[in-house]
Amino acid sequence: MKKKLALGILLLSAITVVAQQENDSIRKTKFKFNGGLESNAQWYLNDVERKIDQPESPLRSNNYLFLKANYGNFTVGTQVESYYKEALLNYNPAFEGTDFSLYWANYRSKILDITAGYFYEQFGSGMLLRAWEDRALGINTALRGGRINFKPTDGVSITALYGRQKSGFHVSDADVFGANADLDLATLFKQDSFGLTAGFSYILKNAEIDESVVDPKFDKETPAYSGRVGFSKGGFYAATEYNYKGEEPIYQPTTGLDYDFIKPGNALLVNLGYSQKGLGIDATLRRMENMSFLSDREPFVYQSNGDQLATNSLDYNDRVLSFTPALTKQHHSNLANIYVYQAQNRVNIDVTTNINKTGEIGGQFDVFYNFKKGSPLGGKYGTKVALNVSNWFNLDADFEFEDENGAYKPDYDAKFLGGGEKYFSDYNIEVSKKFSKNFRGNFMFINQYYNDRLIKGSFIENVVKTNILFAEGIYTFSGSRSLTVGAEHMWADNDRKNWASLLVEYNHNMNWSVFVMDMYNYGFEEEGNLIDDAYDLFKIHFYNAGITYRKNSSRFSLGYGRQRGGLVCAGGVCRFVPPSTGLSFTISTSF
Amino acid sequence: MKKIALLLLFVSTAALAQKELPNLNLKSLDNKSVNIKSDFNEKDKVYVYVFWATWCAPCIQELDAINDVYPDWQEELNMEVIAVSIDDARTGKRVKPLVNGRSWEYNVLLDTNQDLKRSLSIANPPYTIVVKNGAIVFEQAGHAPGSEHDFFKKLKSL
């Protein structure tokens, strides 16, 4: 009944959206209503050449209807989600059917903000607590409970919350309590010549201990806290944040939850920079040790189903409280997104593969510079240059594997400063230049180092070193018409070796655009040590074409093509997608 | 449950109210709390909110292109661009150096956990919202290179 109702609302509201947009009349009412609709559909097809059979339900869609009603200081809202007939391939199995996914009621005044129901939140940089949504990645880790935010005066913000973390249409079992204070000290003490901020967070996770555990050596409550300060003066700024996670048993994908392997975790983040008009310099350094903070003690397991192997919630970045993204540049180039670094926040001690890691240490460095108009390198329109470097290493640590009787008993001691083996590095430079009134270009060179064995914990020694060249030209004709051509090539010394890619996009006006693109992989040995050798063991064109129509707040697009199997990343988190071929259709609108 | 559904249905069919920005505070680049509604409410002034991210190439293209003609636009029309970054903790530290490094003249706000983006049901950046006298008078999903001229004509007509 509930599900049918939800589906009915979804459909009727979709019709209403269209109807509403026809009506331009503006009425002055105090009562406000708005929302949005998003639908991502795929029709998976057989691809004989790639030996891919369409799944049992080939037509799948993820649909989201968001509704919000506001009257003065009060707002109520809901989100209905429908996965019809099933969610898109490799989405979290917790997304199933049609139902109310979120609902909340909120009161907000200048000093008070109270929410009951589902809410999103982030404390500090989110390394201990971030409840967020990313539909493309199938992430929705909202908390269900209550939250109060209090701003007694300018420069003070205090939050207290309680909730259980959402997973699909359910919530996890553990209770999460949190408190946070952010102080803008410069404002509080009426100082204009510099900026000074401080913040503190406390989180308590209460998860039951399985009855089978005799005399547990840990508490069912895990505390975590963090502190941060920021300072700025003129163009200079500096900030640091320290996070500490209390002792809890460690979960490892290979050995599961080990009730005798109990460790705390911590993370340190330092950010320094200088910027003025035309120049920006920034350095971000981070060290993380055992910083995976789950909302339950261990990931929720989804049994194997048909041709789908057993997976767990961690595979979908679900039931996770901490947000520890990779601090690397998120590239616009297609080929630079094949070997993507994922931040290493977990402990892994594995005697079979001899891959032992406890976290990561490293940093990212950026320089942005604008060569002014009229200068020798700036030319008539100026030249913009962006340099980015990132390097990430395993922590330097001593490991133990056995107790005095020779039984498996892992332990480690990680040094505070000191890097171990390198996980990943990325050195890149990007130049954007306007050549004439109608023509502009972007050029990029990217050099990456990707240590697959260490990052993924596999047996096979597989370090991939790549060099990528990317060039893009945009020519605009009169009347908002434009043509974009992007070409790139990647030289890789290992795995699937070389790739070439070409993209052509034509924008007819503000409303219509079409694109065709192809990615071609060549030069590899079929017998070589391929990272993912299950599919596409031949020289293959990954072609795609699509058409988009945009009007006001709505966007419709239709596409056809081949999806490479692998990681699809957005906002610093990646989702594994299986190889597929098919038609895609997306709608998004807000009202 | 049924009652709630009926209520929602009623609401979704009956309400055709004027659309406004939600009453939310965001942080500016110098860490000041800014109300996106009450701090941008000069009578008859045109406020252009561009939602963007450091990883969104078309967004940067759009903001670069507007930046080139921004002084001319401001001379001809009482208008202001507010560039709302939806970068999260992964790329958020790159916002300030990028904005300065590209010599952007905009008022930049940070929607770090994407509360404003979500509240307005924005699916993907770039996304542009034009506000005049408290009401949302124009919205545009996406960006077409070279459409700045047409966009400015639109702004003048609002």
Predicted regions and their residues:
Chain A
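Bacterial Sec-dependent N-terminal signal peptides
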Residues: 1-33, 590-591
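Beta-strand-dominated lipid-handling architectures at cellular/organellar boundaries
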Residues: 20, 36-39, 230
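Signature for the C-terminal beta-barrel architecture of outer-membrane proteins
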Residues: 25-32, 42-60, 76, 85-89, ...
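Predominantly transmembrane beta-strands of Gram-negative outer membrane beta-barrel pores used
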Residues: 64-70, 104, 147, 180
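Post-signal peptide N-terminal segment of secreted/secretory-pathway proteins
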Residues: 70-113
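A mature extracytoplasmic/lumenal domain signature
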Residues: 80-82, 118-120, 287
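Well-ordered mid-protein domain cores that form the structural environment of catalytic cofactors
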Residues: 103-152, 158
